[in-house]
Amino acid sequence: RFYIWVIRGTPLLVQLFIIFYGLPSVGIMLDAFPAAVIAFAFNEGAYCAETMRGALESVPQGQLEAGYCVGMSWWQIMRRIVLPQALRTAVPALSNSLIGMIKDTSLASNITVAELFMAGQRVAARTYIFLPIYCEVAVVYLLFCTVITKLQGLLERQLNAHGFQ
């Protein structure tokens, strides 16, 4: 709970800076890209953990009790009863987290990770053509997010087709 409280209570940009600029003060040197990956993993891990906790808690206790009554082990109950229902509940929120993370990758440019937004900034600074370039960057982000949204819809339909209500 402490990890989730700290990560959810601090901005991702601060987390990036602590990992990239702060860890060298205690002898841990990381290049920019691995530092960004670690920061994003810790950040998304906290949000996804809370999403999954909520999804698991949404499955009625009676479902577990019914599984025990028919002789299932805890692992069988989780795999065959609880997780399919929890996943159906969690997919929209997990997809939203993924979309948020895709958009947040622009923050990695603050620690010199060359990503989409930084590439747009470099081109705009070189050509002095700002609005069209930033609009193109926005369209690329929009396309990424649209693909994730479509995949989420397919996954939700697949889960619904299997009767996980």
Model-derived features: where do they sit?
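Transmembrane alpha-helices and adjacent helix-loop boundaries
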Residues: 1-165
